Amino acid sequence: MPSLRTERRSFGMETPRHSSFRMAEVLYVLSCGGQLEHPHMINVQYPVHQPGPTLRDVKTRLIALRGRGMPDSFSWSYKRNYKDTFIWCDLFDDNFILPLSESGEYALKATKRFDASQVKYLRPPRRSENLEAEGDVSMVVKKGLVLISDTGSVTSNRTMELNKQLMNSLSHSRSAAAVRNNEHSDVSSSDTHYSYEDVIERKDYPARCKSNSGATKRGKASVTPKQCHPSSRPAYWEFSPQGNRTGREDSLMTIGLTKHVVEENEGPTTPRAPARRRTWKKEIDKITIFRESNNSESSDDEQPSVQAETHVSKLSKSGGSYSAAPEDLFLYILRKATRLGSFKPRVCTEVDVVDSTQSKTKMLFRSKTKDEVNRLLYHSPLKQDQSIKK
């Protein structure tokens, strides 16, 4: 029987002969932020059937030496001869690493991967001064409200101090905004302007405005409108029609937040508001219509037409409002409408008077039976007068 020593020697001698892996020395350099570190050298095992080591074999060796996340945080490339110089060829995990033709060495370079999430801006994006001031004020208000609302941990003295700081910061930001507006404004006026907060605090502001407007009316014949403060909010104006107006003055009323009461004199070129369409509704007895149509003479047709046109033109020019139309114009239109064609019982519902001095009548026709027409004609006053004369 062979001894134990002989068996151990034979086993040790046969192991390198029947080994399925080869060893290769690989030189690699790490590049971080454009700077190359000192080169490193490691021994990499790869199978015998391969022409050379792959990138996966190198990563397996580096994971055992430096940890699992190190190889994947770099992009790898190997050095290769190209014409009279050399180049770096990028590698994937299954690509073979080719040696240099002159020395037969394996040279690798590892470049740090680019991560967009870790990139930070050198400075925050710009914001306008007004937005910064509003943001600071809002933060102060929020902090003050949070601290003041916590009554369990904040004493009364601390609460008073926080309230003072809050009011001071608000007043400071308000004054700074007013200074900026005054610097950039072209308004040059010596009148006293009131801000939005002053109007809220002083409740007698509308009364003082009315008194000032009354004094200016008595003192001056022509009033020039005051210039509004540049920081004031836009006001909404609406014309208020007045029946009895002296001269050609128009009064303006403000809706919402009123800043000033402005009065203007209408010049010859001032555009007027378009005339509104007015409608009067009235019902007249059919017997009265028949009596008026038969008793009126043909010579009177021209005179009411002139009066009607004159009256309609006055209505369109005047700015006052009327509750009902005049009686003569209405009856004249009804007489004209009744004479056209044969007489039929009709009821007038409404009359439209337009700015163009034209009148329109809307008549609702309805068919009547012969009995109703005869009864209407028989009981009419005109028919009774004729029967009495006979």
Curated annotation (Swiss-Prot):
One matching Pfam family: SOK
Where's it found, cell-wise?
Cell membrane
UniProt KW Repressor keyword:
no
GO annotations of cellular component type: plasma membrane
Any idea which UniProt keywords this protein has? Answer: Cell cycle, Cell division, Cell membrane, Developmental protein, Membrane
Segment Disordered: which positions? 210-247, 291-321
Which GO terms fall under molecular function for this chain's record?
Answer: protein homodimerization activity
Q: From start to end residue, where is composition biased (Polar residues)?
A: 304-321
Q: From the UniProt entry, list the residue stretches annotated as the region DIX-like oligomerization domain.
A: 22-115
Q: Which GO terms describe its biological process?
A: cell division; plant organ morphogenesis; protein polymerization; regulation of cell division; specification of plant organ axis polarity
User: What binding partners and quaternary form does the record give?
Assistant: Homodimer. Forms long polymer filaments with other SOKs proteins polymers crucial for polar localization and biological activity.
Q: What job does this protein perform?
A: SOSEKI proteins locally interpret global polarity cues and can influence cell division orientation to coordinate cell polarization relative to body axes.
**Entry's PANTHER family?**
PROTEIN SOSEKI 3 (PTHR31083:SF6), UPSTREAM OF FLC PROTEIN (DUF966) (PTHR31083)
Q: What is known of its domains?
A: The DIX-like oligomerization domain is required for polymerization, edge localization and biological activity.
Q: What else is known?
A: 'Soseki' means cornerstone in Japanese.
Q: What is this protein called?
A: Protein SOSEKI 4
**From what organism does this protein derive?**
Physcomitrium patens (Spreading-leaved earth moss)
UniProt lineage = Eukaryota, Viridiplantae, Streptophyta, Embryophyta, Bryophyta
Gene (name only)? SOK4
